[in-house]
């Protein structure tokens, strides 16, 4: 296959070789310029065409600019530079380096620990770390980028060095000795045998480079080393010459996997931080990559052998390393896709996203959209509190009339962030293109940031039915518009075709689907009587069906009580509701004797399940609220700010003068964040509104768009989804608590 690919490229290049008389190669040092000139002379002497000219730049970035300006044509770049050149300047990779025939044009970045330690990828905070050097691919860019992108490490104000210094319990990062964070980042470095050159980014620092970082771990200075997949095997089992490694055995070390597990050193293909792309030659987007490969391929056929007059893949003659190409290159191959994203790969791209924070481009302010006078007051207090602690970027507060107005303002660039609930997140993403930057966590023991919507029935062998057999049954709901008790179950039933509203009249359709229901509402007037038929009001029979605690079947516990007391056959509640009201957790007379084992869940697949199997048997997983921003906003900066802020202000009893997750001081609820929030959390892999909401929730939410509703497809572009429900209601019908 490789022969066919090479042949194709050579034939393709013949069309343009006669037109292009020379290729200008950009170099970044005097030594590289000299090697380039020697290569040009060698190629010319061998009759290789087109001619190769050498243009010297100041750096890789400078060369990229020269290529963009057509003052140069080609340069070999590493992964990070390829990303920047492709994303910002439209350059494309056309020829790749191969270092190992077994794995081709890539290698793997791994995290290594001692086998007898208990460190995992999830417990790296506070451990001592060993790195190959600052800005090195596998020793810095990949691990730090991965930790940021995955949410393990938060970075405020693009200050990555400070974030890493605060995160680890001491490090050796050669090359950071002149930074303001050298105390932590150079703490583990040892220098040479005389104790000089500590933290130098050179072999004078004994813990520099791949072998040095591993030595840092092996000698007990550090707890984790970020190196290449081959580093441990190259320095253990008698494979290393230095005395420090002679007694080391590879079996005494393990790899940290992204899923929190560990693996043997030889399992790097499945257990690594990222697959790292090889260096590649890049050119302008309009240049023929086949021509470049034809030139270099003819060269490597003649000048990649030990006895050849010129050595393409060696820099020894210039007393340097990796000039023009990496010295470890075995051969050059054409890149078929000529696309920087395809060449870099998803794992590497994700890691790079975590590092894409330029302090020079960081906005001075993060403008927060607020919706009420109390929220404006709390936002102002937050801005002052953050500023006093020198948190960056600073907060500014921008007022809006509604969540949708906030979405419009953010899309237009007039404000930057707002916290939204489920259906508003859907609209913000679908209509305005916004993305989640951070989420809320409501219980420390539940890392999913959400809860499950379940349909609960009594365990009764004589009256057993499934979720597909709800027509004609009696239903219990917390209140009209409740996420778990109305939006999701009714939306799901509509989407699955069981409930078919006519003219957007969801209420009538639901009242006709069930035999009877209790759906408490703020104003029961002009409300289908069947939706109040099962409600009982207070102890004196008053306030029946009212959307407040005066109705005994109001709320999630009330809906479950409706089922318990045999008023209804099914209750739509949260997955926690049954447990909160059974086995002694609720002392009220109606619940004190209940056992959760006497109830079951109705599953979408037609089965029933125990109530503790809610993760596998549910109607949807409800997402937590999320901070939404424009897609060009650096989400890691937003989370980095919130994470540092919550360390100071997240505890409701903190003494720092502001409570992020408490609104009682303002005589209101859920201002800026839900009061139930215990922490702001990173979005991790849920970087789009669809990812954040989850497929089941989206299906249920879209189910509210009845297929019988005229103009429903356009309605989503104009009004919130739940407004479709309100089309049939008089003003003030919904209860206040949604």
Swiss-Prot record:
PROSITE patterns: TRANSFERRIN_LIKE_1, TRANSFERRIN_LIKE_2, TRANSFERRIN_LIKE_3, TRANSFERRIN_LIKE_4. Hydrogencarbonate binds at residues 132, 136, 138-139. Residues 23-357, 366-706 form the Transferrin-like domain. Fe(3+) 1 binds at residues 78, 107, 210, 279. GO terms for molecular function: iron ion binding. InterPro entries: Transferrin (IPR016357), Transferrin-like_dom (IPR001156), Transferrin_Fe_BS (IPR018195). Keywords: Cell membrane, Disulfide bond, Glycoprotein, GPI-anchor, Ion transport, Iron, Iron transport, Lipoprotein, Membrane, Metal-binding, Phosphoprotein, Repeat, Signal, Transport, Zinc. Disulfide bonds join 26-63, 36-54, 130-216, 172-189, 186-199, 257-271. Glycans are attached at residues 118, 135, 515. The modification Phosphoserine is found at residue 462. Residues 1-19 form the signal peptide. Belongs to the transferrin family. A lipid is attached at residue 709 (GPI-anchor amidated cysteine). Fe(3+) 2 binds at residues 451, 556, 625. Pfam families: Transferrin. This is Melanotransferrin. It is found in: Cell membrane. GO terms for biological process: iron ion transport; negative regulation of substrate adhesion-dependent cell spreading; positive regulation of extracellular matrix disassembly; positive regulation of plasminogen activation. Residues 710-738 form a propeptide. It is a lipid-anchor; GPI-anchor. GO terms for cellular component: cell surface; extracellular space; plasma membrane; side of membrane. Involved in iron cellular uptake. Seems to be internalized and then recycled back to the cell membrane. Binds a single atom of iron per subunit. Could also bind zinc. Its main location: membrane.
